[in-house]
């Protein structure tokens, strides 16, 4: 969900939770107890290069891959530069569509976190895309050069594969 600001998000959720139509939905037995726990929110700001590298999805369906990178202290700028100048374009060559890139701003690692979403034709193709990407000589060179002053990542990236719901604008 996109909001004008953090405060606007707060206002929007208050309005939503107090909406009579929503309350009526929650009162229906088939919607009781659906969630095992309360949803969590992560507030993010879009990176300055996100809109420039974004691709359209050619065919509906497929899978989305949400990746979270945590860098070593003071290395987020180097990681963003690598994505901006090299990685996003190399993704395109290997069947990965760039959807968006964000920086979290209210987590313990916010100053060192990049979160992005890419699209693949299917889960099996995602593995093939990554294999081709990591073998790409241009990627290998960009990685080597960006890490000339030391490794960038503090730990391996986290990744989650997702499917768009039938009501999602990403379908």
Regions found by a protein language model. Give the residues of each.
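Short S/T/G/P-rich N-terminal loop/turn motif that feeds into the first structured element of a domain
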Residues: 1-141, 146-171
């Amino acid at each position: 969900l996109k909001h004008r600001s953090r405060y606007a998000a707060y206002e929007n959720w208050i309005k939503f939770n107090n909406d009579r139509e929503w309350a009526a939905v929650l009162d229906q037995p088939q919607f009781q107890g659906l969630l095992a726990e309360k949803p969590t929110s992560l507030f993010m700001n879009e990176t300055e290069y996100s809109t420039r590298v974004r691709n359209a999805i050619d065919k509906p369906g497929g899978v989305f891959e949400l990746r979270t990178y945590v860098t070593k202290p003071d290395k987020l700028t180097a990681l963003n530069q690598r994505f901006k100048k090299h990685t996003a374009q190399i993704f395109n060559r290997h069947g990965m569509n760039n959807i968006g890139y964000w920086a979290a701003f209210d987590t313990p690692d916010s100053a060192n976190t990049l979160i992005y979403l890419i699209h693949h034709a299917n889960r099996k193709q995602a593995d093939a895309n990554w294999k081709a990407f990591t073998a790409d000589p241009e990627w290998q060179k960009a990685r080597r050069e960006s890490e000339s002053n030391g490794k960038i990542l503090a730990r391996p990236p986290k990744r989650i594969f997702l499917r768009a719901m039938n009501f999602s604008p990403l379908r």
